Regions:
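Positively charged
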Residues: 2-175
Length: 175
């Protein structure tokens, strides 16, 4: 739900299993819930089976995220209490598909902290400095259900941690 409009411009990119054209012009997509909606405060449940309905939810979330010019979105933001995140830091780069994270778990974070301004598609127009670890190591399943690990730093680490907060009913304004 990080909202960096300058980073999210119109373009198209495809993933092998979660194919969604990029840009603001999207077909009907789920509404993003905003601050005050009880859905944003409920913890999400683990996804027990990765199947086509999970992939379709990821596609719908990507459409909503691209429409809103965001770079990340969590399922609770569209009213679905499942542990699913979509992230696309560079919507203009067709060579890199969006990242789909199912049941993400933090394995480790760096001791080093960074402060950076964040925004959220669920809290439009509000930007605040948030302190987060500069690096994160996570484990998750991808859209095919494969177990994966990923180390991230910089903006990717921040985006992953921001979106994972949504899975626990935490918003960046709580930080």
């Amino acid at each position: 739900s990080l909202n960096f409009a300058a980073m999210a411009r119109q373009s198209e990119r495809q993933s092998s299993t979660v194919m969604v054209p990029k840009g603001q012009e999207q077909p009907e997509s789920p509404r993003i819930h905003t601050l005050g909606a009880s859905e944003l405060r409920q913890p999400a449940k683990r996804i027990s089976k990765v199947n086509e309905s999970v992939r379709e939810l990821a596609r719908e979330m990507l459409r909503s995220m691209y429409s809103a010019q965001g770079i990340g979105l969590a399922a609770p933001q569209v009213g679905v209490h499942q542990q699913l995140l979509v992230i696309d830091l560079d919507p203009e780069e067709a060579a890199n598909p969006p990242l789909v994270l199912i049941n993400p778990e933090v394995v480790a974070t760096s001791g080093e902290l960074d402060t950076y301004e964040e925004g959220c598609l669920s809290i439009p127009g509000v930007y605040l400095n948030v302190v987060r670890p500069s690096q994160v190591d996570i484990k998750y399943r991808d859209e095919l259900g494969r177990p994966l690990r990923r180390k991230a730093d910089g903006l990717m680490a921040r985006c992953i941690l921001h979106e994972m907060d949504h899975l626990n009913g935490v918003l960046f304004v709580d930080r």
